[in-house]
Amino acid sequence: MADYLRQVMPENDSDSEALPRKSEQASLAWAEYTANFEMGLESSKLKNNKNMPEAFLLPNGYPDYLRLILTSRVYDVVTETPLTPVVNISNRLGCKVLLKREDLQPVFSFKLRGAYNKMAHLDPRDCWRGVVTYSTGNHAQGVAYSARKLRIPATIVMPSGTPDIMHMNVSRLGGSVILHGADLDTAKAEAERLEKIYNLISIPPLDDPYVIAGHGTIGMELLHQISSKNLEAVFCCAGEGSLIAGIGIYLKRIAPHVNIIGVEMHNPKATVKSLEGVKYTTLKDAGLFARCATVKTAGRESYRIFQEVVSEVIEVTMDETFGATKDIFEDTRAIIEPAGALVLAGLKKWVSQNPSVNQDRCLVAIASGANVDFDHLRLITERASIAENKGGLHEINGVSRNEEPYLLS
């Protein structure tokens, strides 16, 4: 890696201070989303990259993500998260299954990586203005934590129905929380209004090159922690795409034989449709999970990267997801949020569809976070048990499926 850095980093000159600094240790919703985009793909490229140093752009104008990942600032605040073997599941599936434990981050989510990397690359002369973002929880906590570390005022707009555990943690971390609107699109509109009125700096939860590169450091860590020889596939939540795009673009450059598998809930099909077709797709109705965390469409930059790096997308049901939550607990005694547990559910389904006699093959699932509202633990455990015995139920003891979107935020 040192050799690579010597090749790609420009020589010291008068402009060198404007370049992203290399971390001393650099030798990743349910993913956030918004359904509304006003930009075409080309204009998106120009907008996202207009303030990026030329040395970090490829000849075609797109970001050089390998260089951005290698020079990421995330290790100012995060440590390399462990790869935890899940022995019972491995024995059951006949292969080696590992969890990448992003739930062990300071804010219990991979989102800290992207938020901090973006904010650490802001011009220090502008930071006094403060930052603003919109989120259902995990990105909000990442921004609030980063803002405290970097001493930048932060305003976070969250939907009114955001679980208490989310907005209270954001406030505890020092963020100024505004609860506004019924969904993330409404919160996004309010954040944009505040940005214009108060001249704040926007920290988007998705589709920003520095955010994607921050999440891509997860892929870099994987290849530090495990030999790529037997690594057959890495599974992560498809969502709006910044996580899988960042991990995928690094792994495909360094270990191109590794399959990148996205996992998505059965109802939100925007990601699957976008991957299967040539057009960028936005669904009119994302279905049951639309309150806070539904993915109506992948981010535009993430969608572009999808086409290059993602092998396939597996769909799983809510009951399969809750069953995987129980599997993880039995192996690790950790409660992973359903947005992270669905990845293991997808891994299990993929193994059943792709059997192999090779017991040395290694599969990695990205456990993206552990921000679960305590009040929903009962629903998770009961649904997991029912999924095992009876195949699911519409309503359990008065807790209906209408509450499920908040489990996935």
Curated annotation (Swiss-Prot):
It holds the Pfam family PALP. Belongs to the serine/threonine dehydratase family. InterPro entries: Ser/Thr_Dehydratase, Ser/Thr_deHydtase_PyrdxlP-BS, TrpB-like_PALP, TrpB-like_PALP_sf. Keywords: Lyase, Pyridoxal phosphate, Virulence. The modification N6-(pyridoxal phosphate)lysine is found at residue 111. GO terms for molecular function: L-serine ammonia-lyase activity; pyridoxal phosphate binding; threonine deaminase activity. Threonine dehydratase-like protein; part of the gene clusters that mediate the biosynthesis of the host-selective toxins (HSTs) AK-toxins responsible for Japanese pear black spot disease by the Japanese pear pathotype. AK-toxins are esters of 9,10-epoxy 8-hydroxy 9-methyldecatrienoic acid (EDA). On cellular level, AK-toxins affect plasma membrane of susceptible cells and cause a sudden increase in loss of K(+) after a few minutes of toxin treatment. Gene clusters encoding host-selective toxins (HSTs) are localized on conditionally dispensable chromosomes (CDCs), also called supernumerary chromosomes, where they are present in multiple copies. The CDCs are not essential for saprophytic growth but controls host-selective pathogenicity. Residues 1-21 are annotated as: Disordered. The keyword Lyase applies. Its cofactor is pyridoxal 5'-phosphate. Its EC number is 4.3.1.-. Pyridoxal 5'-phosphate binds at residues 138, 239-243, 368. Coiled coil: none annotated. GO terms for biological process: isoleucine biosynthetic process; L-serine catabolic process; threonine catabolic process. SUPFAM superfamilies: Tryptophan synthase beta subunit-like PLP-dependent enzymes. Pathway: Mycotoxin biosynthesis. This is Threonine dehydratase-like protein AKTS1-1.
